[in-house]
Design a protein with these regions (language model features):
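Extracytoplasmic ligand-binding site segments that recognize negatively charged/polar headgroups
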Residues: 9-26, 114
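Sec-exported extracytoplasmic/periplasmic mature domains
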Residues: 2-3, 28-32, 51, 71-75, ...
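Hydrophobic alpha-helical
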Residues: 17-23, 35, 39-96
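Short beta-strand elements at the ligand-binding edges of bilobed clamshell
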Residues: 1, 14, 99-111
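Residues at the C-termini of beta-strands that transition into short coil/loop
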Residues: 40, 88, 109, 139, ...
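A conserved helix-loop-strand patch within extracytoplasmic ligand-binding domains
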Residues: 1-10
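Electropositive phosphate-/nucleotide-binding environments in soluble metabolic enzymes
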Residues: 17, 64, 108-111, 115
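Hinge/cleft segment of the Venus flytrap/periplasmic-binding protein
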Residues: 7, 112-161
Length: 161
């Protein structure tokens, strides 16, 4: 894996190519690039796979279950020397953020995702030729340094009411 100009070695972990494409698009024009990516195959033991990889400064984990798994194994705010960042939406990931095992968390708006998904599916069921659409949804970003369980938990839970 090549090191970027700033010397930070960041590994992205995902099993969803759509999420990876989103990261690539977001980085376009920023002068940043992905130095290493691990595409997780179904049922693959990702922690075993990580033992084979080079040391990283940060892991960006785009799969909520994997983020929980790595977050549980993190010690002193790091997983094998790497800070953890990722996408998650469970109370467990919020607790891991509060504890300091995860440094940054992106939380998609689960209510909006569910509502719009059902609306599109209903449109397709009711009208055979209806063309289903994709949507951009809202999300919240929480950083460990700015996160306080008492204040921010309500904001997190609000998107799931």
């Amino acid at each position: 894996a090549k090191r970027p100009a700033d010397g930070l070695h960041v590994i992205f972990i995902t099993q969803n190519l759509g999420r990876l494409r989103g990261v690539v698009e977001a980085l376009e024009g920023s002068g940043r690039e992905i130095s290493w990516c691990i595409y997780r195959r179904k049922e693959q033991n990702i922690t075993e796979r990580m033992k084979e990889e080079t040391k990283a400064d940060a892991l960006v984990i785009l799969d909520p279950g994997v983020l929980e798994e790595f977050g549980e194994q993190a010690e002193h705010g790091k997983y094998k020397g790497a800070e953890l960042y990722g996408v998650g939406y469970s109370l467990k990931t919020v607790a891991l953020l509060d504890k300091g095992n995860i440094q940054g968390l992106v939380v998609p708006d689960g209510y909006e995702i569910g509502y719009k998904s059902v609306k599109e599916i209903a449109g397709k069921i009711e009208h055979k030729f209806y063309k289903m659409q994709g949507y951009t949804t809202e999300y919240q970003i929480f950083s460990k340094k700015d996160f306080f369980m008492d204040d921010d938990l309500e904001r997190f839970l609000y998107s799931y009411e």
